[in-house]
């Protein structure tokens, strides 16, 4: 069971799809991530304010994005290839009354393009729509007995003007995905000077740092490797 650890929505249960295809971060690892992001140079909640833009790649339930929003981040963009997981995440956003602070893009993160205006989540008509109000019909999460009735409301998510303060990358393990995602983020200028990148990967996976990336923290947790990085346009 996933819960929000701290902030405005503390102890809220984050619903997840049954028979999920993704691997959600463990509670221990999630606590470790946010302990790092709220201590040391980040003490005083510097990363989480009304202007903070979050990008959650391979978002699944959106646990990391929702935790960030609970702690004060202003806006989050969740990207995942699994339609049903995003639909449930959108319903959860609406239940928290933060549907206007979240975009959902239903696409393989490796195929994301800067020049595209996405209509996030797919409907049966194979159209892309966005935000928590976008979904048609009812999504019911059995374990929490939460029912979401979501009307259609189309809104675009324009990735061409997006720049993010904090990026979460939590892809399937052992797929050599992280290097490809990092190249995509840098190529499309979605990172700015000082952007923090949090990567969860298998301890056996490797990532050769780009010249513009510095390590803030690197640690092993069981079979997982956690990297907290900073992008700097000044590094050469």
Swiss-Prot record:
Protein name: Uncharacterized methylase RP545
Gene3D superfamilies xrefs: Vaccinia Virus protein VP39 (3.40.50.150)
Keyword Transferase: yes
Key words of the record: Methyltransferase, Transferase
Residue ranges that the Swiss-Prot or TrEMBL entry lists as coiled coil: none
Organism the protein comes from: Rickettsia prowazekii (strain Madrid E)
Matches recorded under NCBIfam families: RPE1 (TIGR01045)
Enzyme Commission designation: 2.1.1.-
Annotated signal sequence range: none
TM region(s), chain numbering: none
Residue ranges annotated for the RPE1 insert domain, each copy included: 117-160
Annotated CDD domains: AdoMet_MTases
S-adenosyl-L-methionine found in the keyword field: no
Gene Ontology biological-process annotations: rRNA methylation
One Pfam family named in its UniProt record: Cons_hypoth95
GO molecular function terms listed in the Swiss-Prot or TrEMBL record: methyltransferase activity; nucleic acid binding
